[in-house]
UniProtKB/Swiss-Prot annotation:
List of glycosylated residues: N57, N80, N118, N159, N192, N198
Topological category with respect to the lipid bilayer: Lipid-anchor; GPI-anchor
Function per UniProt: Lytic polysaccharide monooxygenase-like protein that has diverged to biological functions other than polysaccharide degradation since it does not perform oxidative cleavage of polysaccharides. Acts as a cell surface-bound protein that functions in the copper-accumulation pathway. May also act as the major cell wall sensor that regulates MAP kinase-dependent hyphal anastomosis, the fusion of hyphal cells.
Propeptide: 216-244
Keyword check for Lipoprotein: yes
Family under the similarity heading: Belongs to the X325 family.
Protein name (database record): Lytic polysaccharide monooxygenase-like protein ANIA_04702
A single GO molecular function term of this UniProt record: metal ion binding
Annotated Pfam families: BIM1-like_dom
Length: 244
């Protein structure tokens, strides 16, 4: 199976940038579980592990950074939940808080319940972002209308966790989570251009597959119709730009 990308320049945003410091990925909206922008201990001290006990066996160390820890970047479930529309709503995040993210793939999943057993329900078709360079860069991405996965039904007052994954070009996955409580739209704080906008220097590309080449022959490579899967996500981005 061959992986390809198709540029979508019309999706590039034209909004303001904001200044950031060096770190990893941060969820802007809904409110994320907490600050997991920490790197503690050393690779040698952890014997090459991504997570290990400190030498005194009293604390965990994260020599590569907390955000490399599945499912929520080393952060436990939060009691400070954000009300989120019961029919779906906005998800906004900042992807460039670390070196090596000039290109990255974005996944957004949801886990159901106060303490979800897993995050196995994809909310969007994955897409690729293209940043200005491999140095840390400012900027925000917002999907103004992320809907619940097909077949998932929730009620007002139910709890869930939204998981944002940034798959970096060196293969590492960075995890971040936001704990939510479903509410009626009129009971949810307004989402506006202060917390939901798309920065002009971050562009978007689709991710799709082509059929494999059999027996090294030069057979025609067919591209399946992926647009029906990815267009809703990107139309949501474009809609957010128009409404900002």
């Amino acid at each position: 199976m061959l992986m390809s990308t198709s540029p979508s320049p019309w999706l590039a945003a034209a909004m303001l940038c904001i200044g950031l410091a060096n770190a990893h990925t941060v969820i802007v909206y809904p409110g994320y579980r907490g600050n997991n922008l920490h790197t503690t201990g050393t690779v040698e001290g952890a014997d090459g592990l991504g997570i290990a006990w400190s030498s005194d066996n009293e604390t965990l160390i994260y020599p590569y950074g907390m955000q490399w820890s599945y499912p929520c970047g080393g952060m436990p479930t939060s009691e400070n939940r954000t009300k989120w529309p019961v029919q779906g709503g906005a998800v906004s995040f900042q992807p460039g808080w670390f070196q090596g993210h000039s290109r990255a793939q974005i996944y957004i999943n949801i886990g159901l319940g106060t303490v979800p057993p897993n995050m196995s329900h994809p909310m969007i078709t994955p897409f690729e972002i293209v940043g200005p360079d491999n140095d840390p860069y400012p900027g925000t991405i917002c999907l103004p209308q992320v809907r619940l996965p097909a077949g998932i039904e929730v009620q007002v007052g139910d709890n869930a966790t939204i998981q944002v994954i940034e798959l970096a070009q060196h293969g590492a996955a960075l995890y971040n989570c936001a704990d939510i409580t479903f509410a009626e739209p009129e009971d949810v704080a307004e989402v506006n251009s202060t917390n939901c906008f798309n920065s002009s220097h971050i562009s978007f590309e689709t991710i799709f597959t082509t059929s494999s080449l059999e027996n090294a022959g030069l057979e025609a490579v067919t591209v399946p119709s992926f647009l029906t899967a990815v267009v809703p996500t990107f139309l949501g981005i474009a809609y957010g730009l128009l409404m900002a």
